[in-house]
Design a protein with these regions (language model features):
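Transmembrane beta-strand segments that form the barrel wall of outer-membrane beta-barrel proteins
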Residues: 22, 44-54, 63-65, 69, ...
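Outer-membrane beta-barrel strand-turn architecture
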Residues: 40-42, 71-73, 116-118, 160-162, ...
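Periplasmic polypeptide-binding modules associated with outer-membrane biogenesis and secretion
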Residues: 1-54, 281, 306
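Transmembrane beta-barrel outer-membrane domains
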Residues: 14, 27-29, 56-60, 74, ...
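Extracytoplasmic gating/loop element in the C-terminal half of outer-membrane beta-barrel translocons
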Residues: 32, 298-380, 388-390
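Outer-membrane beta-barrel and related beta-rich outer-membrane complex signature
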Residues: 91-95, 149, 166-168, 254-260, ...
Length: 463
């Protein structure tokens, strides 16, 4: 155990390229002398890249440059800075009345990571010395034909592991996201944002101030250390994983606003820098279990649930913190954000803002077939949906009703092929709608390929 701890601690330092621990007999009976040797890693890292983009058929190009110092303070601290830029030509922008067809985005992100927990409370514990503290901040400048946005972010995070890495902890001590929308095309505002049924869409194009604190705990039955990693991969047996996350937003700003008697706007909400801050609570829980049925087969199960609720200074959850269903890791008979909430009927091909919810339920089962080569195969069944906790005008039939819960659960079946390249697993899944809660019909009895079949390309297992 001490050998694994030493090897893992040294290998986890960014300034160390390789580490080796050997033993020689000591003069004292029953004792050994540990000889530790390390080789330093290259301290600097520079990467430049350029790539093409395709967003809903709009072609563009993006480029970035990243610089990283792996030992900036001579104690394996990592400083990283990334500069990025993107251009995209929006099809039909001029015909739609936009002044330009160009989309520009510039970004700068920087982070500083320390190989220990910087806290006076836990600083002397083994977990703290093996943990990590990360400070990061970023800015995004975005101009589109229909609007302009600016994002400013800051994050202060602790990460550590215990029980031979079986238990992992992440404390996001304070995360701030400040979003400004300085300009919106009047025609875009009138046609889309001012429509009463587009309340969620409008929320995404308003100034926002989100502060949050979260804690995530995860458990893995496999003890993964540097010396046992390959053994775990090659001789994988039945395993289980469990995690939960608690996310609280807006508590500190609301406390300060209440103490210092900040002024409220017309909606009775406190503001910071003239922007109402979000306030909500969110809880997620997730469990998965894999059973080895033999050398070439395994059966995997997954269940997940989540609930989020606004309170005090907010009436709705911010869009980026809401739940969605469908996609390569969800109910695979639907594409991402095409399912729910509840019995909600999709309006058009771009209704993803309204297809989100405050409650999520998901259950999945997958029978996997492993071969001697690099290919794997699977058949699967998924069930789940998202709901709102209250009836919103723009999301009719989206509210969760316990008596109707079973009828609101969507179901899909499918099959997939996976390419296991050891360092990465490439997955191609084909899902088919089995039961659609929006129509209350079993599509599986008379499937239509275009309507009911969805193709998913992803990296890694779905769970």
């Amino acid at each position: 155990m001490l050998h694994d701890r030493t090897f893992s601690a040294l290998s986890g330092l960014s300034a160390v390229q390789t580490a080796n621990v050997t033993y020689t007999p000591d003069t004292a009976p029953g004792s050994l002398i540990a000889n530790i040797s390390v080789s330093p890693a290259k301290p600097y890292y520079i990467q430049w890249g350029i790539d093409n983009t395709n967003t809903a058929g709009d072609l563009g190009v993006e480029t970035y440059v990243t610089y990283q110092d792996k030992n900036i303070f001579k104690g394996s601290e990592i400083w990283r800075i990334r500069l990025g830029g993107a251009y995209e030509m929006v099809r039909g922008a001029i015909e739609k009345g936009f002044d330009t067809k160009n989309f520009f985005e510039f970004s700068v992100n920087t982070s500083l990571a320390f190989p220990r927990v910087l806290s006076p409370i836990f600083n002397d514990s083994y977990a703290a010395k093996k943990g990590k503290t990360v400070f990061s901040t970023g800015f995004v400048w975005q101009n589109r034909p229909e609007f302009k946005k600016r994002y400013l972010t800051f994050d202060w995070k602790y990460m550590w592991a215990t029980r031979r890495n079986r238990f992992s902890h992440t404390l996001d001590l304070y995360n701030i996201t400040y979003t400004i929308v300085p300009w919106i095309l009047p025609d875009f505002q009138t046609k889309y944002l001012d429509v009463e049924t587009n309340a969620l869409l409008k929320q995404n194009y308003t100034n926002q101030f989100i502060t949050r604190t979260s804690y995530t705990f995860s458990y893995s039955s496999a003890s993964v250390t540097a010396s046992s990693l390959m053994k775990v991969k090659k001789n994988a047996k039945s395993s289980s994983n469990f995690s939960f996350m608690i996310d609280i937003s807006g508590t500190l700003p609301y406390t300060l606003a209440h103490i210092f008697d900040y002024k409220q706007n017309a909606d009775k909400h406190y503001e910071i820098f003239g922007v109402p801050f979000s306030q909500y609570a969110r809880f997620d829980i997730d469990y998965s279990r894999t059973f080895r049925l033999g050398i070439h087969q395994s059966l995997a199960f997954h269940a997940g649930a989540g609930i989020a609720s606004p309170f005090l200074n907010s009436d709705q959850i911010p869009y980026e913190r809401r739940y969605f269903a469908g996609g390569p890791n969800s109910v695979r008979g639907w594409s991402t954000r095409e399912l729910g909430p509840g019995r909600y009927v999709r309006k058009g091909s771009a209704d993803f803002f309204n297809q989100t919810g405050d409650v999520k339920l998901l259950a999945q089962a997958e029978l996997r077939f492993h071969t001697e080569g690099i290919f794997e195969y699977a058949i699967f069944v998924d069930a789940g949906n998202v709901w709102t906790i209250q009836e919103y005008e723009n999301q009719p039939d989206g509210k969760i009703v316990l008596d109707e819960l079973a009828k609101d659960l969507a179901a899909s079946v499918g099959a997939g092929v996976r390419l296991d390249l050891s360092f990465i697993l490439v997955r191609l899944d084909v899902g088919m709608k089995g039961y659609d809660p929006s129509t209350r019909e079993w599509n599986i009895t008379s499937p239509q390929f275009k309507r009911d079949v969805t193709l998913h390309f992803a990296i890694g297992y779905p769970f």
